[in-house]
Amino acid sequence: MASLEVSRSPLSSRRELEVRSTRQDKYSVLLPTYNERENLPLIVWLLVKSFSESGINYEIIIIDDGSPDGTKDVAEQLEKIYGSDRILLRPREKKLGLGTAYIHGMKHATGNYIIIMDADLSHHPKFVPEFIRKQKEGNFDIVSGTRYKGNGGVYGWDLKRKIIRLYRKEVLEKLIEKCVSKGYVFQMEMIVRARQLNYTIGEVPISFVDRVYGESKLGGNEIVSFLRGLLTLFATT
Amino acid sequence: MTKLAQWLWGLAILGSTWAALTTGALGLELPLSCQEVLWPLPAYLLVSAGCYALGTVGYRVATFHDCEDAARELQSQIQEARADLARRGLRF
């Protein structure tokens, strides 16, 4: 699989990434979906574009929890377009929760790195190669996106906790095993456990774009949930 | 030990030290200036912590980056994606 094409991308980063990642590195993106019929094709297209432009070996695992809006149909069309070696459909009958979605997805993942992100375009897949680069740079076990450092930021005020992270597969398996909370609190708990287990964590500044900016999303509910989650973690870890 | 337990322990130790010193239970004769500072210390520390927290949050909110470029870029890429996918046979 010698890569002698030099004209595909003017960026030296592409060759840099190819040289540094070994032939065996493969990145599995886990995309749990629920009613993402409109967003799913877009995020898959952007992911494919980012990975192809950087010459990264990847697969995208779509875990749909019986979405009533036909997300699964769209996923099947994407599988036909991009191939079943790149788009893996592993749906479930009904909404069974995020944690179990990740476990289910990981069982079918053939990559040695797992990327977890939301399917609703809250994070742009263009950052994924940066995550990969950062991970190689510091040999990190986990790389997390942050809106608060560097040139990270937001467009639109959505307080929902959106998380995008890259994990070594065995690290994610270990952490999921140890975590006990439910919902998005468990994503927070994963970082707490990771620190307890002395895993190394890197950060990449990312931008979050709220596509439906203009609709008010500031809800006290979200703040309350976050504080409750924080207190729960404080008292249990 | 959970973080909560650690904090409770720490507060218990500091609290009992402060109480012992301010009530003279240890029989120590502290100079008056020390006693004057020691007595309101917990309240003072609490208020300072609150001010620091509010100040930090305020500063961070004020300096939060606004990504207009990212929003524009995303919108144009969405157009591109829809066109390309439609060409490849995706029925939206």
Swiss-Prot record, chain B:
Pfam families noted in UniProt: DPM3 (PF08285)
PANTHER family associated with the record: DOLICHOL-PHOSPHATE MANNOSYLTRANSFERASE SUBUNIT 3
UniProt source species: Pongo abelii
Similarity annotation: Belongs to the DPM3 family.
UniProt-recorded name of the protein: Dolichol-phosphate mannosyltransferase subunit 3
Gene: DPM3
Transmembrane helix recorded as keyword: yes
GO biological process, one term: regulation of protein stability
One cellular component term from this protein's GO annotations in UniProt: endoplasmic reticulum membrane
Stretches that traverse the bilayer: 8-28, 37-57
Subcellular location: Endoplasmic reticulum membrane
Source taxonomy: Eukaryota, Metazoa, Chordata, Craniata, Vertebrata
Topology within the bilayer: Multi-pass membrane protein
One Gene Ontology MF term: enzyme activator activity
Membrane as UniProt keyword: yes
Pathway connected to this protein: Protein modification; protein glycosylation
UniProt KW keywords: Endoplasmic reticulum, Membrane, Transmembrane, Transmembrane helix
